Design a protein with these regions (language model features):
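Active-site phosphate/pyrophosphate-binding segments
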Residues: 92, 146-210
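N-terminal export/assembly segments and adjacent metallocofactor-ligating motifs
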Residues: 1-172
């Protein structure tokens, strides 16, 4: 339970309803600007709640920086923001080092969507395909259908090589034959599932994100 300071000691607040009231009352009593410090928030519902407090200054700070993604989205015309991803709608998922089931952005939300695409039933007769490229073992990589390993320094080259296979760049040289073959296979699957495929990158390099 949350703790509430009463005089010189801390006491438990037994319900979150009471805690919400304590926070709301404290914000009203503060009068002026109140600072809310959080990690990056991508949830629309959470943003909606925060927007209800006009005197609230929302500061977002991440122990792990996502500035590369933010700047890439801004440069691409999508605004200086972090998007949300609907993994349940993707038939093909390609991750370039994004541990979306473990530590990347909103893993609880992503795991829920990801699991929907991995279950076969009458409404969903085929399971989504998950390819993963990474420089070290991760929770997400261990769940992939096909996992390709590489040196961390090769992340950018792999992103460019994949883009080249899709017709958008000059292909760099990939020495590892298995890795090069994997890139070609992934690109072919992305093309075959155009409109129902997703590529995410865990890199904090703006150019890789673009």
């Amino acid at each position: 339970f949350p703790l509430h300071k009463v005089k010189d000691k801390f006491e438990e607040v037994p319900t979150f309803e009471q805690f919400d009231k304590l926070v709301g009352d404290a914000m009203k009593a503060a009068g002026g600007s109140v600072v809310l410090l959080t990690s990056t928030i991508v949830s629309p519902s959470t943003k909606e709640i925060i927007a209800k407090f006009p005197n609230l200054k929302h500061v977002q700070y991440d122990a792990v920086s996502y500035s590369g993604m933010i700047l890439a989205n801004e440069a691409s015309g999508f605004g200086k923001r972090i998007p949300s991803y609907n993994f349940s709608a993707a038939k093909v998922i390609v991750s370039l080092g994004a541990d979306f089931l473990g530590t990347w952005l909103s893993p609880v939300e992503f795991a829920k969507g990801y699991s929907k695409g991995r279950k076969i039933d009458e409404k969903n007769p085929s399971m989504s395909k998950h390819y993963h490229f990474e420089g070290h073992l991760s929770m997400t990589g261990s769940n992939a259908d096909e996992r390709f390993t590489h040196r961390p320094s090769e992340t950018g080259a792999i992103a460019v090589a994949l883009l080249a296979e899709l017709g958008g760049a000059v292909a760099p040289s990939i020495a590892d034959a298995k890795l090069a073959a994997g890139i070609k296979k992934v690109a072919a699957d992305l093309k075959a599932n155009n409109g129902a495929a997703m590529v995410v990158s865990g890199s904090n390099d703006k150019n890789v994100q673009i």
